[in-house]
């Protein structure tokens, strides 16, 4: 920033809703397969930040990024996927791309788990730049999930 290679950055961090998985506020906010959370951020959170800190945030989706870890990582991709008019840069660290969506949506029966299996492969290309960071010790977990838990990386190439 000091060398003017990138513009100033405003980082806004939001705590997730309570509980975990289906039936809880967190599943409603972070894991629903729609643009609702992005719309909430756009219409409720960002205007309050602009007013409280006397800022003018860009509306240009090329100048915005969304990021998160765990459920926040999947929420970040969901926000950009369904609202490319708002976000086109995504950073997800150890994103939990699982099915915790609530309420159930028959259009996306696998929730975020469907990104690598059906959603990305069966969709037109989107103007999203995606950075994914994950650990490399998943297979040491004695509770390994389904066999195709790593196919997300194949689907995203």
Language model: regions and residue ranges:
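Non-catalytic cap/lid and distal C-terminal segments of serine-dependent acyl enzymes
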Residues: 1-157
